[in-house]
């Protein structure tokens, strides 16, 4: 029996199972390998000699080193390899052709390769070439195709594209970077109007006749990335976007002199980086606007998720007569910079009535004279609390890159103070997340944790609400990306909750390299209804009515607890000062200092409690004796 099994195993071990597979399946398997690696299989046998070439997707990159016997780079080897693969394929159908080559490649060869795949009906063409074309113009047959669905062209030397006869009726994705559109009138308009089903458009570093009068009109476009950052930063004369079905919009440009026909009816996400020119920055002042981007903001005012760069925050201050109301905005992302002020943020936050999530990418900003005004900045002011914070509807606050110090003007203490200020003044805040680098010192995080405890306690006192504090651990994350909040899960909650979560963004992959950090988190929960006593939720169910009755019964208790807590605030200050002194004198970390202080206080108070108990017992005995004598 064992001998038979060994014979069967021996027969299977000698048999070439892969070679017996259908050739179509073998070609499909080889298509998952780089073509340079799959070409090595041609030496296995005669059957494998040409199989590597029959693959629907061809990707060539001359970054793979092609060396001659002397060890020097030889571009001819790369050119011969591409020619051989294409000749072996013959008229074999091709789906994707990707070519990445530098300025050593012969433009005649590149033109021949492009013509070959275009004649065979390629649907996905990806060209990233630095080639010195004849007359500087790319082959015109690229832009005349019924089969092309995805087209990407990226040059490093600004090659010309002749769009006189462009015809791409089935193109859905277009990516252009560092190209010059050549046309008798307006090359960009001609190109877009010739793409009848275009859905995804990426434009960067391109130029055409009429470049300063930018106009884009497309009823089918859904995603648009538009980079027009000039080296000399010139203000465009006019900008027009007629894209009613656009849902994703990334736009980098200088402030235009005029905005017209801004149609973004379906916009969901927008990332805006508008900037002023050097001339505008020189003459910008609070009394004199140097531009007007109001019409552009009105066009995107129905967006749901908005990301604003620091330059855009400055544009809102110096180039905007009025900030419109963003009635549908639920998530706002602010990218900060130490050279840009926050003067426009108070008005912007006021004009976001349904804002749920606020995200700061860093806490950097330029200190200006407006920082001392109540509604001139988000900084803590001695004149009062900004109304944009005291009446803010924000429920989720996230701060990326907390503690990042860019220059000598950045201060860790200011960032901690700003976090505490947000927590104290934003009444509807339910959750705060801080993402910080593991290089931040442990004592800084420990101090922040203690301040969070105290700030949360004071906030509960000021609001005169009964809380039940509890501790949770730091959320350890191996990535630096923040997940998108699930807004819907919070809209139907009847209970009031507030939590702060400190999260480390790890910069290294191995968890064993992470420094130990004391886990801490604070979450508070109020098991009471937030509805009004009368006139609210009249159509609510029995549970809502019961919650309202619970509020009525517990109202007096809440006030008593709040008053008692206010009386104990001095004791909290005293205990916190003791912990700080122990930490400074002994050198222990914060948690060890808290434990040591606890034992110290217990050691002092227990004898006093025993003595008080003895005195109370003696007093009771004396009273009993006096009662017996009477």
UniProtKB/Swiss-Prot annotation:
<dbReference type="InterPro" id="IPR006566">
    <property type="entry name" value="FBD"/>
</dbReference>
<feature type="repeat" description="LRR 6">
    <location>
        <begin position="337"/>
        <end position="362"/>
    </location>
</feature>
<feature type="repeat" description="LRR 4">
    <location>
        <begin position="228"/>
        <end position="253"/>
    </location>
</feature>
<dbReference type="InterPro" id="IPR036047">
    <property type="entry name" value="F-box-like_dom_sf"/>
</dbReference>
<dbReference type="InterPro" id="IPR055411">
    <property type="entry name" value="LRR_FXL15/At3g58940/PEG3-like"/>
</dbReference>
<keyword id="KW-0433">Leucine-rich repeat</keyword>
<feature type="repeat" description="LRR 2">
    <location>
        <begin position="152"/>
        <end position="178"/>
    </location>
</feature>
<protein>
    <recommendedName>
        <fullName>Putative F-box/LRR-repeat protein At3g49150</fullName>
    </recommendedName>
</protein>
<dbReference type="Pfam" id="PF00646">
    <property type="entry name" value="F-box"/>
</dbReference>
<dbReference type="InterPro" id="IPR032675">
    <property type="entry name" value="LRR_dom_sf"/>
</dbReference>
<feature type="repeat" description="LRR 3">
    <location>
        <begin position="180"/>
        <end position="205"/>
    </location>
</feature>
<feature type="repeat" description="LRR 1">
    <location>
        <begin position="101"/>
        <end position="129"/>
    </location>
</feature>
<feature type="repeat" description="LRR 9">
    <location>
        <begin position="567"/>
        <end position="590"/>
    </location>
</feature>
<dbReference type="Pfam" id="PF24758">
    <property type="entry name" value="LRR_At5g56370"/>
</dbReference>
<dbReference type="InterPro" id="IPR055294">
    <property type="entry name" value="FBL60-like"/>
</dbReference>
<feature type="repeat" description="LRR 8">
    <location>
        <begin position="437"/>
        <end position="465"/>
    </location>
</feature>
<dbReference type="InterPro" id="IPR001810">
    <property type="entry name" value="F-box_dom"/>
</dbReference>
<feature type="repeat" description="LRR 7">
    <location>
        <begin position="406"/>
        <end position="436"/>
    </location>
</feature>
<keyword id="KW-0677">Repeat</keyword>
<feature type="repeat" description="LRR 5">
    <location>
        <begin position="300"/>
        <end position="325"/>
    </location>
</feature>
<dbReference type="InterPro" id="IPR053781">
    <property type="entry name" value="F-box_AtFBL13-like"/>
</dbReference>
<feature type="domain" description="F-box">
    <location>
        <begin position="15"/>
        <end position="63"/>
    </location>
</feature>
């Amino acid at each position: 029996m064992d001998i038979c099994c060994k014979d069967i195993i021996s027969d299977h071990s000698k048999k070439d199972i892969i070679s017996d597979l259908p050739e179509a399946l073998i070609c499909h398997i080889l298509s998952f390998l780089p073509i340079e690696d799959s070409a090595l299989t041609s030496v296995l046998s005669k059957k494998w000699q040409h199989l590597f070439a029959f693959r629907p997707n061809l990707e060539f990159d001359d970054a793979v080193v092609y060396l001659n016997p002397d060890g020097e780079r030889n571009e001819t080897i790369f050119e011969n390899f591409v020619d051989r693969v294409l000749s072996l394929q013959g008229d074999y159908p091709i789906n994707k052709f990707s070519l990445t080559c530098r300025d050593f490649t012969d433009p005649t060869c590149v033109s021949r390769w492009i013509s070959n795949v275009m004649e065979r009906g390629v649907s996905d063409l990806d060209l990233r070439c630095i080639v010195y074309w004849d007359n500087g113009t790319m082959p015109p047959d690229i832009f005349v195709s019924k089969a092309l669905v995805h087209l990407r062209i990226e040059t490093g030397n600004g090659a010309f594209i002749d769009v006189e006869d462009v015809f791409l009726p089935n193109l859905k994705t277009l990516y252009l970077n560092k190209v010059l559109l050549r046309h008798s009138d307006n090359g960009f308009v001609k190109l877009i109007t010739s793409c009848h089903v275009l859905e995804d458009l990426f434009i960067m570093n391109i130029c055409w006749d009429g470049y300063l009068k930018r106009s884009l009109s497309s009823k089918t476009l859904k995603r648009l990335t538009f980079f027009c950052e000039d080296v000399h930063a010139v203000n465009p004369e006019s900008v027009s976007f007629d894209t009613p079905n656009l849902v994703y919009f990334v736009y980098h440009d200088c402030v235009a002199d005029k905005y017209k026909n801004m149609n973004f009816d379906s916009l969901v996400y927008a990332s805006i980086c508008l900037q002023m020119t050097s001339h505008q920055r020189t003459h910008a002042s609070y009394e004199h606007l140097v531009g007007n981007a109001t019409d552009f903001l009105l066009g995107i005012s129905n967006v749901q998720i908005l990301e604003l760069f620091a330059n855009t925050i400055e544009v809102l201050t110096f180039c905007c007569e009025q900030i419109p109301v963003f009635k549908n905005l639920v998530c706002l992302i602010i990218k900060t910079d130490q050279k840009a002020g926050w003067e426009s943020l108070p008005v912007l936050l006021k004009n976001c009535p349904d804002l749920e999530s606020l995200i700061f990418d860093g806490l950097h900003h330029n200190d200006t004279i407006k920082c001392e005004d109540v509604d001139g900045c988000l900084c803590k002011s001695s004149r009062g609390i900004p109304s944009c914070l005291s009446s803010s509807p924000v429920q989720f606050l996230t701060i990326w890159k907390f503690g990042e110090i860019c220059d000598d003007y950045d201060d860790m203490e200011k960032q901690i103070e700003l976090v505490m200020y947000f927590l104290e003044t934003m009444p509807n805040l339910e959750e705060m997340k801080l993402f910080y680098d593991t290089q931040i010192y442990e004592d800084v995080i420990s101090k922040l944790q203690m301040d969070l405890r105290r700030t949360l306690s004071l906030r509960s006192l000021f609001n005169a609400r009964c809380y039940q504090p509890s501790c949770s651990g730091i959320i350890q994350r191996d990535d630096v990306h923040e997940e998108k909040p699930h807004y819907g899960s919070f809209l139907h909650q009847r209970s009031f909750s507030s939590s702060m979560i400190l999260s480390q963004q790890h910069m290294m992959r191995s968890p064993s390299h992470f420094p130990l950090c004391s886990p801490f988190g604070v979450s508070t929960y109020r098991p009471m209804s937030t509805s009004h006593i009368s006139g609210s939720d009249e159509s609510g169910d029995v549970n809502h009515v019961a919650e309202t009755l619970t509020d009525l019964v517990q109202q007096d208790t809440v006030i008593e607890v709040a008053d008692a807590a206010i009386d104990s605030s001095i004791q909290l200050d005293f205990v916190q000062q003791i912990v700080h002194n122990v930490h400074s004198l002994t050198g222990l970390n914060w948690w060890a200092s808290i434990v040591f202080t606890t034992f110290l206080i217990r050691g002092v108070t227990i004898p006093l409690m025993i003595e008080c108990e003895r005195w109370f017992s003696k007093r009771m005995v004396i009273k009993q004796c006096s009662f017996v004598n009477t």
